[in-house]
């Protein structure tokens, strides 16, 4: 039987974090067994503009009229912490779509003062089997609007589009946040720009990799502004990329810079460790400015490394 997962949202005293195990501030749980609640989690920003940040949780095997349709839960923050009853449950109404396989804040894509969210459904069918889809939802005074502002897709059979979704920051510095979606089985990632109307459904950039089995796009993330030029950047992992020599499945991560036109499609930096089958790039994320030098930093996971 598939396990039912839960997540703990933890707030603790930073000065004590290395000497004792912190207690959970809140525990939010799914209401259906084998739904894989908690497979994907993210902060959601402040979706209702009340001054308290919110969270989003995916449960991609949830049955809600359709088998394994999947759902995503929005939980609102408050002065007492996270409300453990969901404010909203999002769904896509298609069986086996894997809706909620990935979830993320989208930033404020229409610059209305309310943060927005994006949800991936990597097995969604719309003319092509398992092409995948990503759904963008806008925040408002009452929270997330359950009707998507935009649905994004790539029209490629078996692309796994939506296996990874993320806010991309504001890559062209126009005041509207942008999003990025990975499609690892077609070794691509797609970047979409925000606007006053929401997300433009025509991608501004398509990023790709020359190795067909590299899993490029399995992980995608905003990187912050790594070169402090005023344009946000993105990072993409390809955890099965084969490097030189015996470096099979060593993995790699690519950093792309933003500019006034959108995103420069040639990588500015290529990161790798050069070890055999360590899956470098399985996870990627912006890290903030960890040394406070004015340049944002990144973090890359290498989950099969054994040192």
Model feature map: region roles:
Residues 1-22:
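Bacterial Sec-dependent N-terminal signal peptides
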Residues 18-307:
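Conserved beta-strand/short-helix segments
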């Amino acid at each position: 039987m598939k396990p039912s997962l839960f997540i703990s949202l933890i707030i603790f005293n930073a000065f004590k974090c290395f000497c004792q195990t912190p207690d959970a501030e809140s525990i939010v749980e799914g209401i259906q067994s084998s739904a894989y609640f908690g497979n994907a989690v993210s902060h959601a920003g402040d979706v209702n503009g009340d001054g308290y940040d919110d969270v989003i949780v995916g449960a991609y095997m949830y049955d809600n009229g359709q088998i394994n349709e999947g759902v995503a839960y929005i939980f609102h923050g408050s002065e007492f912490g996270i409300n453990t009853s969901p404010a909203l449950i999002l769904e896509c109404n298609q069986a086996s779509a894997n809706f909620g396989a990935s979830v993320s804040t989208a930033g404020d894509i229409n610059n209305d003062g309310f943060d927005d969210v994006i949800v991936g459904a990597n097995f969604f069918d719309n003319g092509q089997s398992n092409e995948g889809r990503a759904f963008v939802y806008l925040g408002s005074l009452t929270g997330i609007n359950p009707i998507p502002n935009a649905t994004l897709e790539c029209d490629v059979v078996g692309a796994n589009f939506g296996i990874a979704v993320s806010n991309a920051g504001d890559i062209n510095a126009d005041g509207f946040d942008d999003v990025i979606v990975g499609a690892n089985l077609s070794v691509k990632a797609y970047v979409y720009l925000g606007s006053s109307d929401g997300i433009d459904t025509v991608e501004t950039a398509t990023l790709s990799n020359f190795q067909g089995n590299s899993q490029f796009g399995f992980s995608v993330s905003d990187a912050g502004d790594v070169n402090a030029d005023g344009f946000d950047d993105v990072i993409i992992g390809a955890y099965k990329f084969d490097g030189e020599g015996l470096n099979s499945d060593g993995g790699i991560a690519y950093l792309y810079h933003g500019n006034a036109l959108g995103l420069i499609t040639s990588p500015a930096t290529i990161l790798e460790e050069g070890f055999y089958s360590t899956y470098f790039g399985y996870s990627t994320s912006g890290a903030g400015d960890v040394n406070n030098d004015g340049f944002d930093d990144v973090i890359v996971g290498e989950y099969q490394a054994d040192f």
